[in-house]
């Protein structure tokens, strides 16, 4: 389905390059012009875009912490869950990660404490 939509857009906008969408263990990857780009569809979920908008337009101010939580099926690699949650913290706040401390229990549970630019703490479970 994604490939069909991609082909439609490439034709519509006359890109002139062939492209493909590949399913990987941690989501989807776009292959175009010899380059591979990871797709981040979670950034377009309304709840995250609205939260980002409230932070950027000043509706919410003085943020000191962000908390993210995720419970995923066992077949989804923990690394991809961590990557997604850190990306969400970065996306919503508009700040980059400065440092991370991780505490885990095997390969299925982890707590991350990340410090973002400006001293914002991100707690990821």
State where each predicted segment sits.
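A contiguous active-site-proximal alpha/beta segment in oxidoreductase catalytic domains
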Residues: 2-75
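Rossmann-like dinucleotide-binding domain that binds NAD(P)(H)
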Residues: 66-125
